[in-house]
Structure formats: C-alpha cells, structure tokens
Amino acid sequence: DGNGPKLDAFRAQTDNDNWAYGQWFAKGLNNLHHKVLNQSAYTRKDGSVIIAYTVESQSPCGYKIRDLGISSGKYEITRSRDFGPDDFKFTTNQIWTVYTDGSIELQANIISNEPSLDLARLGYVMKTPEDLGCYTYYGRGPHNNYNDRMNGAFVELYNSTVKEQFVNFPKPQSMGNREGVRWCALTNSEGQGALFISAASPLSASALPWSAMQMVEAPHPYQLPESDGNYLHLDLKMMGLGGSSCGQ
C-alpha cells in the first residue's frame, strides 16, 4: 500500500516558520494535485524503456490558516478561493528510465510560475508500506539536521527505523531531516525493500510514520492518528530552520 513519487514543496511548519507558512497555504502547497499534460515512451536497443511526462502540479484552491493559540497547538484551515490557470503551479518535465535489471532512474526539471516564493522544500514524497520500517542512510546524522544546523552532524552510514526518526516535540512539526544524503534505503525485517541513490548532488531526506498534514493537524503527539504507512521525502533542498521565531 503506497504510491510512487509525487512533487512536494510543503512541510509541517516549525516554530520558526511564522514568517512563511501563511503563503504556503495561500498557494495551496499543502494540497497539490498532479495532472499529466503529455507523455511519450520508447524502448532502447539495450531493452531499457524511456518514459517522458510533462506534469502540472496545482492545488484546486488556496487556503487560509489561523493559529488558535500557542499553547493549544491547533490551527483552523479553511478554503479561501478557487484557483484558475494563472494561479500558483509547478510544471515538471520528467524522464523515467526503466533498466533491464529493474532499477529506475528519474530526471526532473521543475519550474513554477512564481519563482520568488520561499518554498519549504522542493523534491518528491512517496508513501511506502508500513512493513518497510527499517531506515538506512549514508549522510549526515544521527540526529536532526538542516542546512543551517548541520556542522555537528557527520557523514556516516546510519542504521535506524522510521519510528525512531520521530522527535517528540510538544507540537508535531517538520522533523527527521538529514542533509548530505548520498543514498537511503527502506527495508523490511528480512532486508527486502527499495534503495534510493542520488545520481547528482547529495539530497535532503527524511522518513516518518506520518505525513506533513497529519502533523499539522495534530496539536500534540498523542493526538496523531494511527500511522497508515511511511512517508519518504527525497528533496533537492530543504529550507533551514532559522535562528529565531521570525525564521531569519
């Protein structure tokens, strides 16, 4: 039970994201829908298959979010207005290569019609079966680290679990990020699963038992719903945390 990679630019806002998260909801980053505009496919002489897509990612509407009080951890999220073709969206050109050994390569060119918007992240998220709960990665660790808080996290091979990536903050928020990830793997107890490798620069990566919106909607950890799978984020970039409540 799960899904393949979907474009993602949203995170569960941190205590330092007060300056930015209103725009993330206003632009619908919390609810992107993905539509294939065109596609093509062909088979190489070596047997590998090339599949190309142009995908448009846009929310059906914008949202307003209101903090109901610092101590409550609750937010009120409402629809603001329906979106049209000129509202915020991403357009992605994807090239998938399926090799004869079963490995799959994804190359993506991602643009938006509002490049000045400060994004929480830019990458892909996929939901994976809950039994793929063993998380191994070669990158910075073993604790949470972001691009502005990573000097004390060293590049090594780390073995963990998805559940161990969760940090018991009073209010669930963005967590579990690892910078400088060269590769990561999700496997079951028998070592079967999937390996994800960065073919270019190192990634920002995280694996958690809940989605970003599930964490936004839970005032406290004990109010999180029962996990329905694991959520793996593979990002080109993740925004830093900042050093104060204004996020700067």
Segments from the language model and where they lie:
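Beta-strand/loop-rich accessory regions of lumenal/periplasmic or secreted enzymes
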Residues: 1-248
